[in-house]
Amino acid sequence: MTHEPNFRHELSKAESGGALTTETIRAMRRSYGEIGLLESEMMPDPIDQFTKWLAEAAENIVIVEANAMVLSTVEENAPVSRSVLLKEVSGSGFTFFTNYESAKARQIAVNPQISLLFPWYPMERQVMVRGVAEKVSQSDSHDYFVSRPWGSQIGAWASSQSQNLTSREVLEERYSHFANLYPEGSDVPTPPHWGGYLVRPTVIEFWQGRYSRLHDRLRYTRTESGWQLGRLHP
């Protein structure tokens, strides 16, 4: 294992008023561990393999939200990324919920080809997913909406997601309006502009950090007969 430069002293100087230099940024690296990925140890179905990794990430006390994922869409031939939360994984794919009038929803309507990234840095792991997003049924959206905390339900009504907002006060006023309309303890209806997307995967890649940047990358690709597993150069 090679020795990696220690940049924390430089960072402490930068935090106390010094400039964060290019050299300091370039020195920000660490060695990865010895745990590797072998094709023979991977499950035949990548969804099963993902579920196993997700459970392990959820048990890791350093990872705050194991179900957090970076969702990337396309707008005018340019990628747009943001973090959202995975709310269901099944044999069909990965499900998340959002405002159907949001920027991400408008982008999906034009181009449903999306990617997901699960960055489990403390475990030196990543999972990258490519697939096609489609809306889930209204009943599925409703079933999840009623399980949400009351404050989140009201927030879904109050926020015109991705629209311009003149001030924070305007948002708070909208929240108060809907909180009065649907008091805590009452049944809050599912907004017509709110629901879920199912991402049907076509490619799922599992990445494990290794020594000397010789990382393991195992990629499942969907074919007519099922999933094909292959290895990529790091």
Task: Give residue ranges: language-model regions.
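Binding-site signature for planar aromatic cofactors or substrates
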Residues: 2-234
